[in-house]
Amino acid sequence: MSQLKDQSAAASSRRTFIKQAAAVTAVTGTGSIIKTPVYGQNQAPSTGRVIGANARINVGFVGVGNQGFNTHVRQIKNNDAKHNVQATAACDVFSEYRDRAQEFMGVKSGNVYNDHRKLLERKDIDAVVIATVDHWHAPVAIESMEAGKHVLIEKPMTRYLSEGFDVYDTCKRTKRVMQIGAVFCLEEKWHKAAQLVRDDMIGKLVLGQSSYCRNSPKGEWNYTINPKLTDASVAWKRWLGSTGTRPFNADHFFRWRKYNHYCCGILGDLLAHKIHPLMIASGNPEFPNRVACLGTKEITTDRDVPDNTQVLANFPSGYTLMVVGSTVNQQGLPEMLRGHHGTLYFGGDKVDLKPETPFGDEIDPESFSGLKPSGADFVAEHADWFDVIRNGGETKGNIDLSMRAQVVISLAEMSERMSLTLLFDEKSRKITTGTGQEVQPLNYPA
């Protein structure tokens, strides 16, 4: 009986300690979620206008198609007074998109371009939103930061891994503020989970799981083709960029997410929205050390990329991430973060903590609700970026998180396409098989 009392007292003491630790964290702040070292910090930064806490931020937009216009141009313009910003200039290779952006922004024709380099020459532009086709993310981001501009880059950060590290190194060297356009990074529930993990509320992490599943009977990304797109209305060769030479193709222009030349499909478009948050929730995002991915396309065959995919990523701490994506079945996995002592369940603006049965005497079940922002809050995504530009700190989708997530995405694509499980060394940045054979990352044609 005495031994049972001692165990009960120990469990009660541990429960009290955990709650006290959580309270201290809540009062003092969580600090950076990144604990691992970063590279490229010792080089001189680029110059740019110093933006004070009350200064207006002038924003340029590169890529103003559907995502660029509706998510970024429209939202930033509609909230310009609230955020003290001005939608200043826009760039796109398609004249129809340029004209639409110009009219909505209310700017003169001299403020819209078909070459982003002209926009970057302007000294009055402080920040650039990049919502181009994926293979243009890296060159525009790098040139923007070299020109002293802060950047918001739509997910995925880059098309391929090597250029991802080019963006990463440039951001570290120039000290520009970067935000990834994976909007669910802004959801407070993931940051609450990170706090609970750091406070040892669920023990050592075991597995984080999520999914992004749709069912598109006509085929995902088969967007309407605008008949106004012609050889004369689009800078086709410029749009192709480093992907190689091929004849004008409207299907490729509007439905580019289906093709490996330009995109990795579900991985970059949908699962990026789940990989970033699950890495935040871990409390200390790491580079993966092993990634495996499967994929099939037995239902929608009009594409290169899979319509059904599953990703597993291991991390040095022992944490495993599992994400599933589909465009042919909408039933997803429950979102949860499993620890040795307890599990976190996610839903809407809520996180539920439930102890594992063997640890029920040590951990109380708890529910945390009303965690805002919640959902796809693009206004919050922009506000976070602008706030860090003015006041310093880290965005919720910062460069450290984004680079780690990009490694997962890029290795998952390689794994699926090569039918390999791949290992990653964060210090050397080398990719190998389980037998030690080095594997070169996918890249553009020579």
Role assignments for model-derived ranges:
Residues 155:
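Short basic (Lys/Arg) and small-residue
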Residues 230, 237-319:
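Rossmann-like dinucleotide-binding domain that binds NAD(P)(H)
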Residues 2-150, 162-177:
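N-terminal glycine-/serine-/threonine-rich beta1-alpha1-beta2 phosphate-ribose binding loop
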Residues 45, 150, 158-233, 238:
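A contiguous active-site-proximal alpha/beta segment in oxidoreductase catalytic domains
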Residues 94, 211-217, 243, 295-298, ...:
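Glycine-rich beta-alpha junction loops
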Residues 226-245, 352-362:
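Mobile, glycine-enriched helix-loop/loop "lid" segments at the mouths of ligand-binding/catalytic clefts
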Residues 4, 11, 19-32, 44-45, ...:
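C-terminal helical cap and adjacent loop that interface with cofactors, partners, or active-site loops
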Residues 98, 134-136, 152, 165, ...:
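Tryptophan-centric aromatic hotspots in well-structured domains and transmembrane helices
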